[in-house]
Amino acid sequence: MRTLEEVQGTLQIAKVKEEDLQPVTYCLSFGDNVSSGDYCLMEVDENLCKHIESGKSLIIRGDKDEHAVLCSEDKTYDLKIADTSNLLLFVPGCKTPDQLSDIPASPQLMHTQIWGFSNCYWELRRQRPRLKKLKKLLMENPYDGPPVGMQEEAPGLKYSMEDLLERIQASKEELEAHLGNVHACEIDGFWRILDFDYEMKLLGHVTQLVDSESWSFSKVPLSVCLEELGSLEPKAMIEHCLNCYGRRHSDEDNQVMYALDEDKVCRATAQLLLQNAVKFNLSEFQEVWQQSVPEGMGTRLDQLRGLALIDRSSKPETISLLRVEDLPEDTLERFNSLFSLREKWTQDDIEPYIQDLCGEKQTTGALLTKHARSSMQNGIKVYNSRRPVAT
């Protein structure tokens, strides 16, 4: 190990004035069997640092064919290796001048060992959770109601929350939120997505009961629904349907009530009508759609944002099913898919199909500026692809 005199001699050779430096000098040496593969360094922001210091975990998720992501309890981060021009040394106990409480007046030499080294580190960048795979897994075995009589439930894969966390690249909070978005429910410890026809059957039971009892859509009593419909379907499924299409609240007698969401009911009804047709005459569709929803509810085309695409250039005007969840998750692939469907888009038409691609503090306008080219057509701004569209 070096002595203080040797360090001072080195400074003289280098023509560095000792008074220009801090009085404490660290003399570094490599420990036994130190390897660059012993440690991985990761750059974290203040929030993640507090997360780790509080004793919480960070989890790396991804199958063998996927790019790894890092997840906290509520956020997902992209993991990338960043190279550095200088070698990074891992030196526990090495203090910066502001961390030294008592700075000695005379020069002092401190010996410490290097525990590891690396010329790269993991760089984290906040990203959207990759949730498209979730619906794909759940649709392997959709739930279409309890077995009838001696009939057994059709065999198929089932996934618990732990199973899904192993397969889906998302934090637990993001995963739980998306399970609610796709109307999944937990049955016997496994998360299941309802077959859409079965889901609409449940909704039909509820809306027919509301009509027969002349209830207000904003005051649907849970207890009566369960009592009246419990002989037709499992009570848990009736309550799940109310949770999907209504808002839970209590009346003045503290009775649990639901306020049915007009937009959600009308949107689901539209999907039922559109799913078996390639294209629908728009005016005819609007008429059938209004006739199909519960009396007292009003249909509007803005209820179909991200669900259906209207072609106003055709004669007559048409409407077809185009669900945002069926489009690619990757931004470039999403734009390529959209521009292969339609060469030019107005901002109002394309916005529902790219809104979910926006990162933190990013707008759809910024996305369009980056991935599309604008022009005027008949006085209306339209967007077309900046790149050749792959077919």
UniProtKB/Swiss-Prot annotation:
Subcellular location: Nucleus
GO cellular component, one term: chromatin
Xref: Pfam families: Dcc1
One GO MF term attached to the UniProt entry: DNA binding
Subunit structure: Component of the ctf18-RFC complex which consists of ctf18, ctf8, dscc1 and the RFC complex.
PANTHER family, A to Z: SISTER CHROMATID COHESION PROTEIN DCC1, SISTER CHROMATID COHESION PROTEIN DCC1-RELATED
Protein name (record): Sister chromatid cohesion protein DCC1
Organism whose genome encodes this protein: Danio rerio
Gene coding for it: dscc1
